[in-house]
Amino acid sequence: HREVFNAALRKRLDALAGGAPAEVFISSMDQSERTMTAVVATDRGERSYLLPAESAPELLGENRLSLLRAKLATTQPIALTARDGLPLHGYLTLPEGVEARKLPLVLLVHGGPWIRDRWSAGASNRSLQQFLANRGYAVLQINYRGSSGYGRAFMEKAIGEFAGKMHDDLVDGVRWAVQQGLADPARVAIYGAS
């Protein structure tokens, strides 16, 4: 989530996304803070723009996974409740052209804990998500307690819970996917690094 207090700048940034779901952010600016570069990131790629102070945006470049000759999967945000009642969020990437029913599942765990998984193409593990989904796997990512972006109290819930409730959050995510009918409980793998 972003909040832009300058209404004119907010309008310019929103226009870059063209109404599509996207993360739009300023990546740099000059000393006058009037000319800047902005990035529009989706689950399919990123575009960088130069935003001159008084003229139309100029496309600087694109990083698009969709240029690959492969069917790309869509990543959707999900919400679930941990066994102790804590609300959790994450992301689910499903293979294209396959019924989302009892799929093999890879639980893709981010490092940290004081980082998080993100939706956009700039997210860590985006290429791995697409690789696995392209081969028929559902990919589940859970922002377990201690992940950044949910406030200090959420981060502090990780204290003393590295092999406890943080682990439970991941298991609860897999159980959620099984209960939704998306994942086959006999075909679950876990992958991650820090």
Q: Where do the protein language model's features map onto the residues?
A:
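Trp- and S/T/G-rich repeat-edge/linker motifs of beta-rich repeat architectures
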Residues: 12-15
